[in-house]
Amino acid sequence: MRINKEGYKIIGISGAVCLLLWWLFYHLLVHDANVSLLWFSTLVLLLFWFFIVAFFREPRRVRIHDTDLVFAPCDGRVVVTEVVSEDEYLKEEMLQISIFMSITNVHMNWVPVGGEVEYFKYHPGRFLVAWHPKSSTENERTTTVVRMPSGQKVLFRQIAGLIARRIISYMTVGHQVEQNLSLIHISEPTRRSYI
């Protein structure tokens, strides 16, 4: 396992803040001889910092390639499976599968299919809670369409949540992508839909 490069700055800043808070607690609490409270604050700050480090973890995965399959692009829980009318690019009825990523899930996303990136668009928007039904259409999001070698097209979206403010995408139109290649890092809990 390694740490995603998008997390280096946040991990460093949060580590510095935790050290500063610990130093303040030390000087405030040791003078009062409240050692048990000092140990408790040390534990809380360490757990907070380890949580931030774990949020940016990028586990090594066995990359499987199968051109007949569409792989789940992220960790999480399937919350919606329904037929929808896709009006942005494909303009037809498609099967939508939405996956909710909680704060404890790995926030790396992988390309669900291999092929050529045919369409990519960033949509500014609101920051509704990720499980809100309108979050798929009203929240900040990116939309990507990959054309597989067979000609079939797969559309997938990264959708920001209530706390999310950043979606970092590595996609460009015309780019050839491999199935299960690292696609994006989402810096907060979110929802992911693909059609």
Regions found by a protein language model. Give the residues of each.
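Membrane-cytosol interface motif
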Residues: D66-V84
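Membrane-interfacial hairpin junctions
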Residues: H27-L37
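A structural signal for short beta-strand/turn segments enriched in small hydrophobics and glycine
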Residues: G76-V78, G115, G174-L183
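Short, conserved beta-turn/loop elements at beta-strand boundaries and strand-helix junctions
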Residues: E82-E86, Y122-R126
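N-terminal membrane-targeting/pre-transmembrane regions
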Residues: M1-V17
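Single conserved hydrophobic/aromatic residue that forms the stacking wall/gate
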Residues: I184-I195
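Short histidine-centered loop motifs in beta-beta connectors
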Residues: W110, R157-E178
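Transmembrane alpha-helices and immediately adjacent membrane-cytoplasm interface residues
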Residues: F40-I64
